[in-house]
Amino acid sequence: MWFFESSISITESGVLQGMTDCHSHLLPSVDDGVKTEKDTFVILDEMERQGVRKVWLTPHIMEDIPNETVMLQQKFQNLRQEYRGKVELSLAAEYMLDVLFEKRLQQDDLLPLEEDKRYLLVETSYFNPPMDLLSTLKRIQSKGYYPLLAHPERYEYMQMKDYKHLKEDRISFQLNVPSLTGMYGKHVQKKAEILLKAGMYDYIGNDTHSVDFYLRLLQCNIRKKVAINLANRNRGFD
């Protein structure tokens, strides 16, 4: 069985070496992520030791956490001025596909990941799809953005046919590395491995919310075959 195969810790595997982390909650005191600047710097120092090259700070924006773009930009500038490490920092946001998002999209009041294209990191409920998901994603595209679906392996309502349909519609996928370690459960782990093997992921992230979470991730095991696949794919994620 797949879960009896040899494994290695995330730290020992070296899969984070050279990584661009496209999903994190390291901007302090703006959502359910890191609460203090000190904790942010502890995580960034450890990321630097692991060889992480760049981190996108992607705070939540949703009806329950209605962060304002200007406020996030100001907090990010303050953080970057205080940071003395070598990891490159950039600001974007993770958007829940809800009523607030529709308003922000209409106003073009958004924080995209500006890599080679303007990607919008978006998420849905883990259990229930939003109404007209595909229509919403197509509206994002019509505005000149590229939808980047956060941690698709975690959506219980999605099956392989759903992932294939989304890829056919040019929707990009972002892998949560913790999914490959079983931190979210074996079912999510298996889905993540299948999607990775199928080459469906476009970007990766750790979705770090706290010091404890990140340190635990580093000690978690990943199957060696999966680690090799991730390391090889990681070269194409940047």
Residue ranges and their predicted role:
Residues 1-87:
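An N-terminally biased module of ancient metal coordination in phosphate/nucleic-acid-related enzymes
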Residues 4, 9, 218-238:
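Mid-to-C-terminal alpha-helical segments outside catalytic/metal-binding sites
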Residues 20-24, 55-57, 89-93, 120-122, ...:
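Hydrophobic faces of well-ordered beta-strands that scaffold small-molecule active sites
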Residues 25-27, 60-61, 92-98, 125-127, ...:
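Active-site beta-loop-alpha junctions enriched in small/polar residues
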Residues 34-36, 64, 128-129, 155-158, ...:
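Acidic-and-aromatic substrate-binding clefts and catalytic sites of carbohydrate-active enzymes
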Residues 48, 141, 196-197:
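Non-catalytic positions within long, well-ordered alpha-helices that form the structural scaffold/packing
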Residues 66-170:
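Extended substrate/RNA-proximal surfaces in nucleic-acid metabolism proteins
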Residues 201-216:
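Short acidic/histidine-rich active-site segments
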